[in-house]
Amino acid sequence: MKSLKIRFRRFLLEKLSFYFKLIKTFLEFISLLINSFAMGDLKY
């Protein structure tokens, strides 16, 4: 029972870290888009 719990916790941590990386890259992409739009507005 205990080994199953530990395995499950490790599985959860791996999933969380994966989703965290995904969200982080997504946010960086959005900020890049916003920055490029701001630069485009400044040009005009």
Swiss-Prot record:
Origin: domain of life: Eukaryota
A cellular component term, taken from the record's GO annotations: chloroplast
Chief site of localization: plastid
Compartments where located: Plastid, Chloroplast
Keywords: Chloroplast, Plastid
Protein's name according to its UniProt entry: Uncharacterized 5.4 kDa protein in trnK-psbC intergenic region
